[in-house]
Amino acid sequence: MIKVWDYLKEYDAMREEILDAVDQVFKNGVLVFGPKLQEFEEKFSEYNQCKFGIGVGNCTDAITIALRACNIGSGDEVITTSNTAVPTVTAIVNSGASVKFVDINEYSLIDVSKITNAINDKTKAIIPVHLYGQMCDMNAIMNIAKK
């Protein structure tokens, strides 16, 4: 195994907070659509400065809903990184669009310098993938996406 991210340091720093949150959910007895979900949705929408935040069951559902909300479907292309998990690709295919892969940079993230060349008339979205505690260069990606 190649260790690229020491998640245990982060977990150790937040362990009590995580265990307390899980304990509260189980003590409440409502595992689905409970008060913790509502609290998360409110905080998420506030943090993102949007009207609504909707908790879903998994990444595939979240990306599929986002693509459908943007009317992305058959005949469209969505750019993402070649270094991604199956849910990213599954969501794009679920929406009816085609996947266009862009290679990675030295940090294993989408190579921003290659995105522009991948764009064509069918391109409707770019889905960056943040990995190993690293963020993609979202400012650069958003600047490309706005064009």
Language-model segments: which ranges?
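PLP-dependent aminotransferase class I/II
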Residues: 8, 20, 35-43, 47-53, ...
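PLP-dependent aminotransferase-like
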Residues: 68-147
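Phosphate-binding glycine-rich loop
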Residues: 30-77, 91-95, 101
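N-terminal "arm"/small-domain region of PLP-dependent enzymes with the aminotransferase-like
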Residues: 1-30, 35
